[in-house]
Amino acid sequence: VIIGCPATDTKHTNCIHEDPRVIIGNNNIIREFSLIEQPCYEEKTIVGNDVFLMQGVHISHDVCLQDKVVITNTSVLAGIVKVLEGANIAMACTINQYTVIGQYSIVATNAACMKNVKPFSRYIPGKPLSVNYYAIKKFGFEAYEKEIEEYVLNNQELVSGPLKMIVAEFNFWVVKYGHQTY
């Protein structure tokens, strides 16, 4: 495992941050051959709490992984990616820079993810977004299942308090980084 190596960035090939901070929370599992770069543009590269990085994961500069994120074998996250709470990146995925992966969503195996992924959704290339029922059950959102279905499948606005807060945070990052959403 390599933590805090210089950022790999094509715009600033020798990007050396004056005060490089890689913040790693508690109860994380970081498996062999994984790499976490120091920041280049923002103040920190962050790995939250209860994060599982499987073998050969590449976390580029300025990435933020919130709590309970799972990133599986040989996935690569480009710089300045945000993976929000409870999201799952399946095996051998590549996530484009400035992309936001919403809370409790999953990106399918071998996906090249070029846009943001809505909370509670399953992104499978070439298919319409679907609902991540596994995460709904795992994280205790069963009472909101129908509302989540309408949000993911029909773009209906969420009205329940906890869901509104989740989407508000997702939308904040989407607006900040400007990528389109699947």
Give the residues covered by each predicted segment:
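Short, amphipathic C-terminal "tail helix"
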Residues: 162-182
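Glycine-rich hexapeptide-repeat left-handed beta-helix
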Residues: 1-24, 29-49, 55-168
